[in-house]
């Protein structure tokens, strides 16, 4: 049996709503809507026999992870492998300001190129993959929830599904979405990505639907 990993993006924050990039800045917590989103994810995963709940060290991810862990009576394990992307000078800025001040860098990053100060897709994918391998070794044949961030989850899915870096943004990872990856030996399979059926009702999911894959 494989290790089943549920990659969850944290719930929404006021910064997300304002289109402001938090990056790795401390002190950015879930909004009221974000807490409700986290509770919806927790209800969805309550029936899954999770062996561990792992989180990025950032507040918004830890709050989401703690909500998921509560029904399972598990302690959240913080792991730097699932940290947010490093955005350097972009952190704290609104999206419009980033595009105005760094237009060439924004285009380069969108095209999958490496820009000084901004973590590369390859770097994100490598640390996310290493973290996944470690969890698979620690929890063989078990289920684990991992709370992370949009670009790192995109990068991991892109590596598993052989999506080139310049197509990273084609993978949508919304707040409080669930993406399921099964890991068996050296192989990994994406069952589905960006599922939000727990928030929006049947059919509100990404690629493919959990209903199609027989998944939670």
What function would you assign to each model-found segment?
Residues 1-3, 85-96, 137, 142-143, ...:
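Acidic, low-complexity terminal tails and accessory targeting/binding regions
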Residues 13, 152-153:
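Short active-site segment of divalent metal-dependent hydrolases/proteases
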Residues 29, 71-129, 189-195, 202-212, ...:
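Phosphate-handling substructures
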Residues 39-46, 125, 129-137, 157:
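Generic structural signal for well-ordered alpha-helical scaffold segments
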Residues 67, 155-159:
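Active-site signature of alpha/beta-hydrolase-fold catalytic machinery across serine-
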Residues 149:
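Short basic (Lys/Arg) and small-residue
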């Amino acid at each position: 049996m494989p290790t089943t990993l549920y990659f969850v993006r944290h719930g929404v924050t006021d910064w997300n709503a304002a289109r402001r990039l938090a990056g790795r800045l401390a002190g950015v917590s879930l909004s009221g809507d974000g807490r409700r989103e986290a509770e919806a994810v927790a209800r969805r995963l309550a029936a899954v026999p999770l062996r561990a709940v792992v989180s990025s060290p950032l507040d918004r991810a830890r709050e989401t992870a703690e909500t998921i862990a509560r029904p399972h009576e598990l302690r959240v394990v913080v792991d730097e492998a699932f940290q947010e992307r490093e955005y350097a000078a972009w952190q704290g800025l609104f999206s419009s300001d980033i595009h105005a001040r760094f237009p060439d860098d924004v285009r380069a990053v969108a095209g999958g190129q490496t820009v000084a100060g901004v973590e590369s897709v390859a770097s994100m994918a490598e640390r996310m993959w290493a973290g996944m391998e470690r969890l698979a070794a620690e929890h063989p044949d078990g289920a684990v929830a991992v709370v992370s961030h949009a670009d790192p989850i995109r990068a991991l899915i892109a590596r598993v599904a052989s999506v080139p870096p310049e197509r990273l943004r084609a993978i949508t990872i919304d707040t409080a979405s669930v993406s399921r990856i099964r890991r068996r030996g050296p192989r990994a399979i994406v069952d589905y990505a960006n599922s939000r059926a727990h928030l929006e009702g049947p059919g509100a999911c990404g690629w493919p639907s959990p209903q199609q894959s027989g998944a939670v």
